[in-house]
């Protein structure tokens, strides 16, 4: 007793200290994040998320613990207290269990508890450490009542030995120290459940704030909002309540089985009447949850991947849903029956259990189990028989209504129903006069691709080791073609397709000898400048032509060098410091007594002090201590370089920045930089990130190879590269999901009309969304059920040679005039070929300019016309003797020829094919444009420039 008392006296202070440590750390997290969200102007957004997370986490934890420990307390009260059967105060009401049976049952229950604990722990971990590269979807929450859950657990154990060892340890602990281990597991299990519930705060908010779609599903007639906003919450509640219910039942059973020294005596006397009534009550509750499970499963048939189409097919509608109903009824009746026995159960006669046929005692309890299994197995057999005898012989007739549903739903969910389909009949009418009429299209033909341009930038424009170009992006700018006599006069300008690349600071490239705390957090704080290249121009030596490049000019050492005065007027540059970007992964403090490296100049450096709006004051007082704790950076406390104005700039990675503010949105993988004047003299550079609302809950919508079956580009996010401010602009006000989030966070979103005009002119149709739609359109352009069923008109994404390897054609941006338009637009285009063939069948275009933004156009070629596809043109190019001879000569001459993207360019009612050839010398990796190949109909030419190639192609001189 003294030893136990000493242990208790030691444990209490330790637990108290650990508790204070955890609470203190949580307090630091909350206060630090509150200050950051205040700086961003989104404190209300953070507080709403936090309050729901805390409320749901604590609420579910308290309810779960209350239920579990109340039942364990009842079990302690009702368990056998004495070891001798003749002295039991209550007669057993069930047969006794020998030692072998006791060990088998206890081991099985312990293994199940251990498996549940591991499963719920992994689920909680996945919710609180999300992979933002994956779609942000309603989690696949498999209930322990599902066979798929058992299969998943067994798979995990077989592939991870340590999980099996943990389960074995828990089983052993439950056999030896039952009460102690049950209490520990109860607490851990409850904590995991509370993390899961808190991590699903978004589902709760969507449930209460959900905006109806005003579209009903074709099977049950529910508004689609029920499936997207409400059904995920019911699945979550099932997961929570089922987990608590099963664990509590098993914990109570173990408590009863190991009472009365049953392991020592080698036998369990049987369950008493109070024990049985307790177990009946728990079983009754689980049967009630099984009813909920079958109700949910009936709705989940609308996402069935089996059958001819995605969603509920003939068998699901005529058999599957009724099997779920019958199984639910059986579970409901069983729940009522067990509930009645728990409330009004009468004492059975003891002599019944001394009968030699005592196994018959279990018969009434096995009836619902057998009935349940019979219905389930019969349903599987009947479904298979009907599939073979009724459906397969007349599959199109039987499945036609469900094919129509899938086509209609998939097209609506991916916005394919908004596509304006037209016929494009190519004519042999392309000549010099037509080219002149479409000179803006010709002047914007993309010879430079982002990949070779980045390679060139890294060789010629990085300037210092610590600078890096992480990415390059296609955009368009209005470039002036003449200078006005007076500034206030209207400027004459043309659209110019360009490639822009940010020169960011890559601290990982700083030499090890210079890798100090001061350099990392006080000196190397930002990148500087960008390059801007027209896609169609080539400088001397085949290098890119730059509108904007370098750092420093004769007039101003901090300015970027521009190609002409016209570019000075066209492109706002200012002091292009990049404090927030794609590589800014570390936090910095500024201003301090240490000057920041601004940019290199000659053999030295120019220094600067940040004067932007970003950052949290940490120069003095408690905030310095707070963020030293939050960042675990004790150097902050001892640094003598801070001033009262010193600010902390953290979460400077733009993806992490926007995900922290709005984690419920999905973000495009490719943010792009924009140089635009929004009225701030110190900030001209901005990042635009496309954000999506997605779901995997749209009934009958086929996700294909994706994990989601509904998507909208609902939000455009703008991040200031200097100040770090973030603005969310709603781009699709008709999307019910973004309408729901706007109701939840009314101060988070702005109308797209509020975006500055200079930025709005740079929004573009996102490639990620377009690629998804283009992939879905391969099959779902077929709207006739019979054509769809037979796959008579299946399309494919064509192949091209890029570099030296074949690859699928990616979408590409063009400035071109659509067939029915009178002016050039910024277009995203994707070609198609028929299945197993190489000729073109169609091309899809997405518009990006002004009021036309977001409109999709599909131009289909007449099926009787043969139009060359990319692979066929590539073959013609490689078969041309002059071209192949020249390429072979280069490849033998210490260089390597890389083929660029083959662009198919619609010009009025004709198609022009253009492919640049890059030359890379063996001694360096700088790609240069060596030749441009142009094809029209059966004619192919290769010349040093695009202009020469076009002149030769349309002059009739191809000798």
Curated annotation (Swiss-Prot):
The chain crosses the membrane at residues 13-33, 50-70, 99-119, 156-176, 184-204, 239-259, 276-296, 319-339, 362-382. It is found in: Cell membrane. It is a multi-pass membrane protein. It holds the Pfam family UPF0182. Keywords: Cell membrane, Membrane, Transmembrane, Transmembrane helix. GO terms for cellular component: extracellular region; plasma membrane. Belongs to the UPF0182 family. This is UPF0182 protein MAE_41360.
